[in-house]
Structure formats: C-alpha cells, structure tokens
C-alpha cells in the first residue's frame, strides 16, 4: 500500500524549498488503469488540505492576499483569438472543430466566454472543442479573506486527466469512429493538445513570485510562509472533469484557484513519450518545482478492480464482460504506458499491490 502521509510530507517539503521561487508546485501521478492513482491523488490532496485547515484553526487571521506578483502573469497571450463569427460557427458545430478532431498538431485557441458560474473568462479550446475547454477567470474583484470560511481554503487541488477525454460526439467524427469508441481511453482519444496547454499555463503560474512584508525565519513553517504570499493577481483556472454516468466530460468541474499552491495531476499518459504527451514532463520540470510518481502494480490485481468499475458504471452488464473489456482495452493501454515511459531519472516508483 502507498503511504500517502509520507507523500504529503514530501510534497510539502518541496513547496517549502521552492516557496521563494515558485508560486505553486506540481505533482505528476501516473499509473495504469486500476492502479489506484485517482484514490491516491484524492487521499494526498485531502491530507494536505486537512493539515492546512488545522494550521488555520490554530492561527486565525493569518492569511493575506496581496497584489504583488513578479512577473505579472499573462497566461495565454500567445494564443490566436477566435473572432465572434468563428465562435458562432464552433457553437453551431456542437462546440467542435470538425476538420481537426484527430489533429494532434492543432494549436489551442482562445475566445471570450463565461464560466459555469456566469463569470467573465477566457476560454481555451483545442481539437476536443468546448467539452475539454480550460477557462481562465478575469481577475477583478479583490478577495475578502474575512468572508471566507477557513475550511473552504484549500491549498491542494487534483486535476484528473479524465476531463480531457474526447467527447463521444467528437469520436463520432473520427475517420474510424467504431474503433475510436472501442479504444476509448487510448492516447488518441484524449485532447492532449489542450492538456499540454493546461500544463503550460500552470508552469507560468508556478514561476511567479510574490513578495511579502513579513520576514521569515528558518523556524517558520511552510503554512506560515504561504499564508502570507497569496496573490490577487493569480486567476482562477477552471478545468473539466468526467461524468462516468453521462460518459462524457463535464465543464468547470475543478478550480485551480489563487489559493492553490499544490496541483496534483493524475492520469495514464502524463509520462508517455509520444506526441503532445511527451512535452508535459519538460514543461513542468523546467519550473524546478515538480515531483513525479509512477505507480507499479501487477495486471492481475488491476483486472478485477477495473472489471468491477466497468460494471458499476454501466459500461458492461456482467463481471465477465468487464474482464473482457479490460483485456481488450485497458490492459493494452497499461502495457502501452509501460512500453513508452519517458526516460528521465527522477521518476519515483511506488507499489500499490
């Protein structure tokens, strides 16, 4: 079993080490289907946030949000802007770019939009269209910390790769839609274009620095340091999740807020050495604030887990069908990951048998 408390300590130590140079740190957590990566990511996130909530309960009124940020962050200035008529055409096509659904070289583009909460934002879309959109909220109203419940301030946030599954409508437009649906979960059935763009955005925010009027000492805790270095200038970033009942992405399910100092990215292909996936590691590693974990587990153990999950989510009607689906798709994806793992020295391998 994975010691998630030890992982939490390692992540907080990285944040402590880098807090003068990086606004946030990132964690990559990779494993084959059924390896437990989602559960581990959720536990890790919960442990870190609970530790911070305990700190806040013992140190009331410690949080400060200022507007001192270096450099001033412009997250998507290099992206092409869609014109209103182009946005209208995209919406008319059910939020898709019909000629680019399989184009892994399609460059993400941006346009003015609204979040699910009806806030002004910049939407960033790629070959998956609006289903896999990233939405960056407009920075405007200052945060009033006194009106925030302390247990609502989370410094860790998970970002599952699942939200970047191409929608079923998108897969329908593939040259071979039948195979695309059957092999859903393989590398080509994710919007790797926009997930890489998300990593570029996170890297930019990571490299921002916030000055503080407070002098920190060697005895100052990491929670004390980060509580004095939240920035109003860091925008909220909304990313999609995945609804297993609907079998499609759901918009704005996760929010990477200005309080998020640890981003836990979990998924199958984040260390994959092909197409856009191969650029993710370097994009985040170049910030100097990255931890990378690969979960190793025997395929015999994952077969039953995944078969039961397929049955519970309604993808199959019997456990036997679930096992067959695992062998014809999930197992292939797991082996693909192992055969195409990027070659870097700092991947920490952990067992979860």
From Swiss-Prot:
SUPFAM superfamilies: P-loop containing nucleoside triphosphate hydrolases (SSF52540)
EC annotation from Swiss-Prot or TrEMBL: 2.7.1.-
InterPro entries in UniProt: P-loop_NTPase
Superkingdom of the organism of origin: Eukaryota
Keyword set, alphabetical order: ATP-binding, Kinase, Nucleotide-binding, Transferase
Residues at which ATP binds: 31-39
Sample GO molecular function, one term: kinase activity
Homology family: Belongs to the YFH7 family.
Chain's role: ATP-dependent kinase that could be involved in endoplasmic reticulum membrane assembly.
Name recorded for this polypeptide: ATP-dependent kinase YFH7
């Amino acid at each position: 079993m994975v010691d998630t408390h030890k992982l939490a300590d390692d992540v907080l130590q990285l944040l402590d080490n880098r807090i003068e140079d990086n606004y946030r740190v990132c964690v990559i957590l990779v494993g084959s289907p059924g390896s437990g990566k989602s559960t581990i990511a959720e536990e890790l996130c919960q442990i870190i946030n609970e530790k911070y909530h305990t700190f806040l309960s013992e140190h009331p009124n410690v949080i400060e949000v200022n507007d001192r940020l270096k450099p001033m962050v412009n997250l998507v200035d290099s992206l092409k802007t869609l014109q209103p008529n182009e946005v209208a055409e995209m919406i008319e096509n059910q939020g898709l770019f019909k000629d680019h659904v399989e184009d892994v070289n399609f460059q993400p583009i941006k346009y003015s939009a609204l979040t699910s909460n009806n806030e002004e934002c910049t939407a960033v879309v790629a070959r998956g269209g609006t289903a896999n959109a990233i939405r960056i909220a407009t920075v405007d109203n200052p945060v009033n910390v006194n009106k925030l419940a302390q247990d609502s301030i989370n410094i860790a946030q998970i970002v599952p790769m699942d939200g970047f599954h191409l929608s079923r409508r998108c897969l329908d437009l593939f040259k071979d839609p039948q195979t695309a649906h059957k092999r859903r979960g393989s590398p080509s059935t994710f919007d790797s274009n926009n997930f890489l763009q998300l990593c570029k955005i996170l890297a930019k925010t990571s490299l921002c620095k916030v000055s503080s009027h407070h002098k920190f000492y060697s005895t100052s805790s990491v929670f004390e340091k980060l509580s004095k270095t939240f920035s109003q200038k860091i925008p909220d970033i909304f990313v999609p999740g995945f609804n297993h009942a609907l079998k499609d992405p759901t918009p704005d399910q996760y929010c990477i807020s200005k309080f998020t100092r640890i981003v836990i990215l979990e998924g199958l292909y984040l260390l994959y050495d092909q197409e856009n996936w191969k650029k993710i590691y370097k994009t985040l590693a170049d910030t100097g604030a990255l931890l990378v974990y690969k979960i190793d587990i025997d395929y015999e153990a994952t077969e039953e887990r995944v078969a039961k999950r397929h049955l519970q989510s309604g993808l199959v009607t019997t456990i036997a069908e679930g096992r067959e689906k695992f062998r014809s798709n999930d197992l292939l994806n797991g082996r693909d990951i192992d055969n195409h793992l990027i070659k870097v020295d700092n991947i920490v391998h952990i067992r979860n048998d």
